[in-house]
């Protein structure tokens, strides 16, 4: 793959964020031997907000995650975000919805929490069923690798046609009066 001439010379130094841990894995969703899966676990009690596509035909992961914002979650449940690249899990009908349910259920089982506290995102090929087992079988490995760092690996895991990983950071100080 040819790297864009606009690519920065290095990935920026992104600091860990207290209360968040992440891990990546090579699930082989579309390509073998490529990091294509990212998981983020937020401590129990984390408040969440999200921005979703305005597309009139959102995929099953978007539908699930929109509902997850409204579902009641036990106060001691961690929040999870699971993102895969290689398959968008869109326009495969019931198979898309089944893959979402299996992924959220297994993520909650392995990482702790409830399926309703799992947010899902998929990017990649449209119209092909997603084999959720390729993702869920990596969860034990990812759980044992959870760490506060890993932003560059996370950026690489969600690349589709990108030629380089992208990252940015900004620090903000707020005064409470």
Model regions: which residues?
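Contiguous domain-boundary segments centered on the initiation and propagation of an alpha-helix
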Residues: 142-173
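A glycine-rich phosphate/pyrophosphate-binding beta-strand-loop-alpha-helix module
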Residues: 77-86, 90-145
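Short capping/connector residues at structural and topological boundaries
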Residues: 67, 130-131, 163
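Structural beta-strand/beta-sheet cores of well-ordered domains, especially the beta-sheet scaffolds
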Residues: 35-37, 60, 156, 168
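N-terminal amphipathic/basic leader segments beginning at the initiator methionine
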Residues: 1-53, 57
